[in-house]
From Swiss-Prot:
One of its GO terms (cellular component) is cytoplasm. It comes from Micrococcus luteus (strain ATCC 4698 / DSM 20030 / JCM 1464 / CCM 169 / CCUG 5858 / IAM 1056 / NBRC 3333 / NCIMB 9278 / NCTC 2665 / VKM Ac-2230) (Micrococcus lysodeikticus). Its EC number is 3.6.1.31. InterPro entries: HisE, PRib-ATP_PPHydrolase-like. SUPFAM superfamilies: all-alpha NTP pyrophosphatases (SSF101386). Belongs to the PRA-PH family. It is an enzyme of class 3 (hydrolase). GO terms for biological process: L-histidine biosynthetic process. Keywords: Amino-acid biosynthesis, ATP-binding, Cytoplasm, Histidine biosynthesis, Hydrolase, Nucleotide-binding. Pathway: Amino-acid biosynthesis; L-histidine biosynthesis; L-histidine from 5-phospho-alpha-D-ribose 1-diphosphate: step 2/9. GO terms for molecular function: ATP binding; phosphoribosyl-ATP diphosphatase activity. The lineage of its organism: Bacteria, Bacillati, Actinomycetota, Actinomycetes, Micrococcales. This is Phosphoribosyl-ATP pyrophosphatase.
């Protein structure tokens, strides 16, 4: 199990190291527009899972949304601290 901060650190490391075949690297390379489409898609899936599926399914969809939001943050150069200042 990972925390939000640990996931951000892992994704940042992957983007810096650029391992071959990394989905994270591919998503970053696709750009903000493509990442934004994934964020919207995952947000809709969270909503549908919360309305019609189990808590486990909703939690899985939320985890995927958090992943895509973090890739957006990395693509834009937004740190966790930048976000935490607004909480």
């Amino acid at each position: 199990m990972k925390t939000f901060d640990e996931l951000y650190a892992e994704l940042t490391r992957k983007v810096q190291e650029r391992p071959e075949g990394s989905g994270t690297v591919a998503q970053i390379d696709a750009g903000v527009h493509a990442i934004g489409k994934k964020v919207v898609e995952e947000a809709a899936e969270v909503w549908m899972a919360a309305e019609y599926e189990s808590d486990e399914a909703a939690a899985e969809e939320i985890s995927q949304l958090l992943y895509h939001v973090q890739t957006m943050m990395i693509a834009r150069g937004i740190s966790l601290e930048d976000v935490y200042r607004h909480l």
